[in-house]
From Swiss-Prot:
GO terms for molecular function: D-tyrosyl-tRNA(Tyr) deacylase activity; Gly-tRNA(Ala) deacylase activity; Ser(Gly)-tRNA(Ala) hydrolase activity; tRNA binding. It comes from Listeria welshimeri serovar 6b (strain ATCC 35897 / DSM 20650 / CCUG 15529 / CIP 8149 / NCTC 11857 / SLCC 5334 / V8). Its EC number is 3.1.1.96. Homodimer. HAMAP family: Deacylase_Dtd. GO terms for biological process: D-amino acid catabolic process. This is D-aminoacyl-tRNA deacylase. It catalyses: glycyl-tRNA(Ala) + H2O = tRNA(Ala) + glycine + H(+); a D-aminoacyl-tRNA + H2O = a tRNA + a D-alpha-amino acid + H(+). The gene is dtd. One of its GO terms (cellular component) is cytoplasm. InterPro entries: Daa-tRNA_deacyls_DTD (IPR003732), DTD-like_sf (IPR023509).
Length: 150
């Protein structure tokens, strides 16, 4: 599982030029799944996201988590996080989880974030979406469950 996490002032997602979800501040997450991801992977990553200390304290050090600071989450499914561009010029997506499995895990991930007490707005799984983000910092981090659980 990969999560591209961006700290943001605001973020929104539109489908067919209509805004369907938006947040006023917090985290924008682009979320992708691979074949061996499990519900346990999802739970681990949800805890990691809400516990990361990526907001500044009074000393301007990244020392405060979203759980401590408060804020909302915009979660957007993003199968292209598992694009393989090692051969040729066209990306391959064979490392991405099949749609049905990915959707199930994506829904579970958003449920876990909600259960942790956050307002979670989402995109539409499988839809072509426009995502607008006003990045704060900018702070952008790639979380990869395979790398973090070695």
């Amino acid at each position: 599982m990969r999560v591209l996490l961006q700290r943001c002032y605001e973020a929104s997602v539109s489908v067919e030029e209509e805004v369907i979800s938006e947040i006023a501040g917090g985290l924008c997450l682009l979320v992708g799944f691979t074949h061996d991801d499990t519900p346990e992977t999802v739970e681990y990553m949800a805890k990691k996201v809400v516990g990361l200390r990526i907001f500044e304290d009074e000393s301007e050090k990244m020392n405060i988590s979203l759980a401590e600071r408060g804020g909302a989450i915009l979660s957007v499914s993003q199968f292209t996080l598992y694009a393989d561009v090692s051969k040729g010029k066209r990306p391959s997506f064979t490392k991405s989880a099949p749609g049905e499995k990915a959707e199930r895990l994506y829904d579970l991930f958003n449920t876990k974030l909600s259960e942790a007490g956050f307002i979670v707005e989402t995109g539409v799984f499988g839809a072509f979406m426009d995502v607008k983000i006003i990045n704060h910092g900018p702070i952008t981090m790639m979380l990869d469950s395979a790398e973090m659980r070695k």
